[in-house]
Amino acid sequence: MGQRVSRLGMIAMTLLAAGVALYSLRFAAAPFGAWPGIGPDIRGVIEQFPVRALIHMLVAPVALLIGPFQFLPSLRARFPRLHRWSGRVYVAACVIAGLGGLATALHASGGPVAGFGFGLLAVLWIGVTLGAWRAAVQRRFQRHRLLMRFSYALTFAAVTLRLQIPIGFALGYDGYAAMSPWLAYTSWIPNVIAVAIYSAAAQRRAALAVPA
């Protein structure tokens, strides 16, 4: 039962990540003066800071797409070289998109409260991902896998944020800028808490499985 739930959760996570990543391709039209599905708040940020904003918006989906496959034990075992190279691409995408996000957070449409939240997310995203990469280089694979869980929890904020936007409208907020002061925190803090709970439970199960 537990394995089935875990498998279904992985499938749901992958599908949501793929959907958001593909939807983000609409930002590629912005340099050509087209704004498909891009609201005025986001458009304003892109028009004011096109390079840093588009770097974040077009590179982050790469990490979002790659991430779920890095957690598949069968892929790691059968194709270790592919796992390593896709992991390098993931790390590079997180760092580049994180730097773009950090630079853009300074001018968040939701003001300084939103800017601080998104800036903190970017700093943690870069730091945790680089820590996971360093652990892999040092062959500390248990720590590497733990930090990669937290890294992808931060990456997955792109999905969580979009899932929460309809809630904002239901609560009476009239646009993204009005919601972003709380989305800047609720998009990623619950993800981190969920990973912390999951990792602690996994550690307890592993300890119980060790014969006395």
What are these regions (language model features)?
Residues 1-212:
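Alpha-helical membrane insertion/targeting regions
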